[in-house]
UniProtKB/Swiss-Prot annotation:
GO terms for MF: ATP binding; ATP-dependent activity, acting on DNA; ATP-dependent DNA damage sensor activity; ATPase binding; single-stranded DNA binding
Database matches in SUPFAM superfamilies: P-loop containing nucleoside triphosphate hydrolases (SSF52540)
The name this protein goes by in its record: RAD51-like protein 1
Keyword check for Cytoplasm: no
Record's function text: Has a role in the homologous recombination repair (HRR) of genomic DNA during meiosis. Required for rad-51 recruitment onto ssDNA gaps generated at stalled replication fork barriers.
Organism ancestry: Eukaryota, Metazoa, Ecdysozoa, Nematoda, Chromadorea
Location, primary (coarse class): nucleus
Description of how the protein assembles with itself and partners: Interacts with brc-2 and rad-51.
One biological process term in Gene Ontology: telomere maintenance
Source superkingdom: Eukaryota
Subcellular location: Nucleus
Amino acid sequence: MDSSKITFEYETAYELLVRLGADGLFLHTSLPTLNKVLELVPGKCYELDGDIGSGKTQLCYSLAAKLLLTKKTAKIGWISAVPLRTDHLSQHISSTDADETSHLLDRIVCKRVEMVSELRDSLNALCETINMQLVIVENIDAILHDTAYDREMGRNVQIDISERLRKLTRSGITVMVTNHITYWRGYPAPALGNFWASQIENRFFVERRSEESNVRSVSTMRGGNEKTIRVDFEISDGGLKAVV
């Protein structure tokens, strides 16, 4: 055999597992192209960072809908300062049966919180909920906004909350947090400051490509010398769409 004619094709660990039929080890959205970037592993904590209207919540809707459709007993915790828009989430569920959709939504445990103490109580309660597999904390900067201004007390609160998030992951629960971004010297950075940013290793940046376009993108920066990986998507009445 002429070894000079042997060719190799690079693939990530995620692509290898998918090729071997083990993609059930990951959490998915409705778009395979997004899943290749996110590579969401159960029992980890992730954060989506982006401006208002960038598509962070829509990504969470898609993730939640996919889990409800594929894991028949799984429960999802949804923590937010505003009520969950079940009508918007339902657009990501492919079923046209209203009763089936209602049954799926019944497996979402909603916690409306505005104060840190309520966030603590909600995280504790969800950690003890049977069959809880995913916890989404929407706009955590709205709940922890004061911690960005009080350096000592704020850091203690952020440590406490991040430890409670890790407690969820140690129980095998996946955590997805959404956070707004601020701009420092023209560069985007997660809200709540550098210390909070250091508490969550797995981050994704979600952005709208332009004001005139419905195209969004989600990207991640890998460690070391690896380049940023980005994929585009659109938001439609039926959920997320791939950009061809």
